[in-house]
């Protein structure tokens, strides 16, 4: 089985998350995409202290109508920071027959040298870099820490970095939705409409539960 991994705080989940997951699923013929909310993200302060369970509930609502999308709360049961490499290792142990594709935004990939045990990520699964409009595939090579560039071969025609482990880093261009969870929280905090920025079920849940009414 080919499985995508999309992690994040999902505070809240929005339509760009869903569209990126769907584009990766379609492009790479994935059987499923696992949405994995971060319990304690190492690179991002949790603005507003929205509980992990609430963020998981929003993702479940957002993905309920797509049989290829699933939600895992595995990071909620693990103490300490939610490091991606630990999640990937746990998934590989749980699903030893799966081929994994770790989905990451281009902004995050440019900073991957600061991630915990980042070298092990490249040696554990494929990566798909979802690019913002205007970003170039050549940025893949430029973003790699100098210490590990020799571990890769770059194939510009395929927009792919091949790692010596046999896994690859793929560049997915043309993801046009520039939506941020921060801006959605700001609108919700002010009582403004967030319609069409999040799925209808998520909008209703946010409004009914007043999740961001007292945020910030």
Swiss-Prot record:
Pathway: Cofactor biosynthesis; NAD(+) biosynthesis; deamido-NAD(+) from nicotinate D-ribonucleotide: step 1/1. CDD domains: NMNAT. The keyword Nucleotide-binding applies. Keywords: ATP-binding, NAD, Nucleotide-binding, Nucleotidyltransferase, Pyridine nucleotide biosynthesis, Transferase. It catalyses: nicotinate beta-D-ribonucleotide + ATP + H(+) = deamido-NAD(+) + diphosphate. It holds the Pfam family CTP_transf_like. Belongs to the NadD family. HAMAP family: NaMN_adenylyltr. PANTHER family: NICOTINATE-NUCLEOTIDE ADENYLYLTRANSFERASE-RELATED, PHOSPHOPANTETHEINE ADENYLYLTRANSFERASE. This is Probable nicotinate-nucleotide adenylyltransferase. It comes from Geobacter sulfurreducens (strain ATCC 51573 / DSM 12127 / PCA).
